[in-house]
């Protein structure tokens, strides 16, 4: 312990507090409270809550929702396990039959995300993601500002197609290597505090860029795929991959640029203009990768093919007779099968580009959570609970939509600092779908900012895995992360509200003052 510096001690204490208790006990205090509170709310709702104009089935679904939401928030049992409850409770309450419930777990949306995961695993297996990232950084130059921006662009781009966590885990070791090189090669006129500020800026910028980049595509982050699924389930309308990119990519670009300016020139302002050895290290790592291998080329071609099909489906494939019923999930499965089909040249390592061994690396729990959320939303709709909630929410009719959007964005963004972003989106979006009918606005005016905000957690290590990875480097304290993250939260709120008001309506072709009827 005597050899630990203050940062190491803080990190050790933090990790002990949040992990050791879980290792030594089956349940921590919060989980025990949730474990009891969930079923208790279920029973009390059934016994004591009998409002007018709400059927017994509606009351039953409300009770289920409170139980599931409590377990999701407290993580009393694994979130994915909680997401299996609709399969049990909805048929028991005669709300939906087993076939109707289980069909939600096989929704096209889930297969879109599954295909995205498989493509990401293929990129990681053959190291294409590292080559792309290093190329981007190498292109942008040697100044500290450009290196910082290069890392953010590379991480943000990767995060559009692989998980936020994977993107950050790829980039952090490269960033730490550059920091180490800078410390070893620092010039006599380079102040130690300048290097310290730069290393804090770099690791935090990588973490934030991983979170921001997820907003770029529908497969970039779970809240967006939940948005697509819940919107389609509630209203029978679709958000296409291509149209979301027209919204998401500019959002990512603007946020990355604003956060880069804030981190480089305000939060971690320093006098070091160039980084000793930084460019040389990047070139060395590129050299170590060697020439692009056959397998990398195959994955790149399949990736470009998938992107082309997703982007053109709306205005090209839909107009061809034999592809008119093709959905984004269909394309995802097509590219997945291609990756399983194409042989690899390096057969000592793997016989094909990917094989079924990758199945163990797929986040099945996330896919089950999606299914549980869709099943619960179906139950809310079919039981009449959605219409009843809409009637109750008419109390806020007449409030400015801008105020509602702002409040939703702030509430969800700060809520997701302490709860799972996926669980938050799964809980909040069906409620907002109903709220849109009550306040006479288009549902996407409320659902889009909530989904985007659910992805944005910058203040705490527990807020999102990228933050935890950054904190784990020992380069940044919780206090500093919270103070910097607070201002990044505010930047995100402003950008999200502006995007929702000025970009979403024309791109998606909606009139924000026209509500949609629930299915």
Swiss-Prot record:
Pfam families: Na_sulph_symp
Matching InterPro entries: SLC13A/DASS
Transmembrane parts of this sequence: 29-49, 59-79, 103-123, 136-156, 159-179, 201-221, 241-261, 297-317, 322-342, 362-382, 395-415, 428-448, 451-471, 490-510
CDD domains noted in UniProt: SLC13_permease
Keyword Ribonucleoprotein annotated: no
One GO process term, biological-process aspect: sodium ion transport
Protein localization: Cell membrane
Membrane topology, as annotated: Multi-pass membrane protein
Family: Belongs to the SLC13A/DASS transporter (TC 2.A.47) family. NADC subfamily.
Name of the protein: Sodium-dependent dicarboxylate transporter SdcS
